[in-house]
Regions:
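Single-stranded RNA-binding regions, centering on S1/OB-family and related RNA-binding modules
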Residues: 1-182
Length: 182
């Protein structure tokens, strides 16, 4: 391959016994100098997916999250829906920013699945990720399915990040769920 299409796989990442010409699956991302780097490690999430990651550091440009690779993942301030602290677990989605870098966002609504396996009456666990006076409490069931405690039902004390025991009260045609904690 020409130099433009080459990607570095650091020698410590090369599996023992690998020979030139062997093929392998790698994950490619940009390092802090914007160079493409390959790794044989699997990150905790791929582009468009959601996952709960631990905040490893908070800096002046945002928070950094442990996502299973050597270089932590940036959660920019403008993608945070609330202030995060070191050591906290946060639900995020992975996206590609304007400069073609991988970043995290806490604005996960559009990344959550509407293909729920649950039916009315099922008991589920959900993580609060957003609270709206108009709509209610937005919850990610199993950290991946879209659900809502409608405003008329939302009577408890809710805060983003809190995990609730819920019951499915409705599954709409579009696959989104209404849930209740009553």
């Amino acid at each position: 391959a020409d130099a433009k299409n080459r990607v570095l796989l650091p020698s410590k990442q090369v599996p023992e016994g690998t020979k030139e010409g062997d093929s392998m699956e790698v994950f490619i991302y940009k390092d802090s100098q914007d160079r493409l780097i390959a790794t044989t490690k699997e990150p905790k999430l791929q582009v468009g997916q959601t996952a709960v990651l631990k905040v490893s550091q908070v800096t002046r440009i945002g928070a950094f999250l442990d996502w299973g690779l050597e270089k932590d993942l940036l959660l920019p301030y403008h993608e945070q829906t609330l202030k995060v602290r070191e050591g906290e677990d946060v639900l995020v989605a992975l996206y590609i920013d304007k400069s073609s870098r991988l970043c995290a966002t806490m604005k996960v609504y559009h990344y959550l699945s509407t293909r729920t396996p649950y039916v009315v009456g099922d008991m589920v666990k959900g993580r609060v990720y957003e609270i709206s006076d108009r709509f209610g409490v937005f919850v990610a069931v199993d950290d991946k399915y879209s659900a809502l405690i409608p405003a008329r039902e939302a009577k408890g004390k809710y805060r983003p990040g809190k995990i609730l025991e819920l019951r499915v009260s409705e599954v709409k045609e579009d696959g989104k769920m209404n849930v209740t904690d009553r």
